[in-house]
């Protein structure tokens, strides 16, 4: 079956250095799964917190299912993530270090199950963001120059 991407968190790559990646399952309601299959989710400004040895995803917005009834879900509810205890303990140890946080990078279906890819992230300073933008601009200009050169030949 493979993977089917639902959404990416491009803002996370702009605002953070991603040091390590983890995969986690999600505890969802039926209407949430149907909404995700329609691609109706937003990862911007979402983050994960660990409480009592369990990990929860905050600010993940999943639009209400269009054909749902009164049993439809709350779009911004807290969602529990499913990970091995050792992985959660490893994340918790890293989070206690200054400057680390856990952010979702992408949401996808893997073999029919909804998964979220979490990144152990460290915040970027303003000058780091500027540096990344300069590199991106330079690579874009180089690619454009190469295209122009290949067109002229």
UniProtKB/Swiss-Prot annotation:
The keyword Translocase does not apply. Keywords: Cytoplasm, RNA-binding. GO terms for molecular function: RNA binding. InterPro entries: SmpB, SsrA-bd_prot, SsrA-bd_prot_CS. The keyword Cytoplasm applies. It is found in: Cytoplasm. It comes from the Bacteria. GO terms for cellular component: cytosol. Belongs to the SmpB family. Required for rescue of stalled ribosomes mediated by trans-translation. Binds to transfer-messenger RNA (tmRNA), required for stable association of tmRNA with ribosomes. tmRNA and SmpB together mimic tRNA shape, replacing the anticodon stem-loop with SmpB. tmRNA is encoded by the ssrA gene; the 2 termini fold to resemble tRNA(Ala) and it encodes a 'tag peptide', a short internal open reading frame. During trans-translation Ala-aminoacylated tmRNA acts like a tRNA, entering the A-site of stalled ribosomes, displacing the stalled mRNA. This is SsrA-binding protein. The lineage of its organism: Bacteria, Pseudomonadati, Thermodesulfobacteriota, Desulfuromonadia, Geobacterales. The gene is smpB.
